[in-house]
Amino acid sequence: GDLAQRLEQGRRYLFEEARQYINRQFELYARNAGEQLREEFLLETRLGAIDPRDAKRMHRIVRRMAKQLATKYAKRRKHTKRGVLDVRRTLRKNMAHDGIPFETIWKQTKIDRPKIVAICDVSGSVAASARFLLLFLYSLNEVIATLRAFAFSGNLIEISDILEHKEVEQGIPEILEKVGFRPTDYGRSLADFTENSLDSIDRRTTVVILGDGRSNNTDPRTDLMRIIHDRAKSVIWLNPEPETFWGTGDSEMLRYKAFCHVAQHCSTVKDLERIINDVLKTYFRA
């Protein structure tokens, strides 16, 4: 009887342990599956519609994406830098070995790391997209040689200093305080940029402009866009609005588009990743 009782207790104990183990595994799986589903949902969610409760999760996602791109292009840079075999110098170096190439000499291929100028509309309708673009770019510091950032609504200021000394998340409130919450004036902002910072652009610079191109019926100053276009390696305009809205109401997008190498609808973090990948690709052709 005593043995039977102990066996029964042992059976119950094992059963309870197994039940708890299964419950723990199920909870873990459900939590991981839930997290993965949430991430997949956020990748496709309009940046302006991200729930504030998901902000930290979004920052993690953006940093992870940027790290993956940085790793990919840092490797490609190493691989490409070696260039091709310098036959003449290799033969000359190995004369003492009857021309048998014990020591190979490679032609060095110079690869310029990207120079990027980011010009972001931080007025109400577009501020969320600007935040994530800046977070993405500033997480790519190991593959970008120089990054200068500007923000505007009614006028434009350089924000590189703020973002050098603060994380993007901490810097954004200060930037908005200085230049946000005003009626957008693209013409005035382009004038501020060309008067004070045109020297930040040369033939190796990609200019990334983020904005909806809605200028409250003020002069769009497309003449200044032409100047920027002619100086840069490329001008890429990211617009959170769908293309069907470009050129409607006070949108000057179709006029600006004429002075962009690329103009694309960009409203999700997945769009951002694809476009930034395309930019990096132009510098690191394998």
Model-derived segments and their meaning:
Residues 1-113:
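Acidic/polar low-complexity segments with low predicted structural confidence
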Residues 68, 106, 128-185:
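Metal-dependent catalytic core segments for phosphate chemistry
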Residues 226-286:
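Von Willebrand factor type A / integrin I
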Residues 118, 149-151, 207-209, 237:
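Structural beta-sheet core signal
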Residues 218-221:
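Conserved alpha-helical "signature site"
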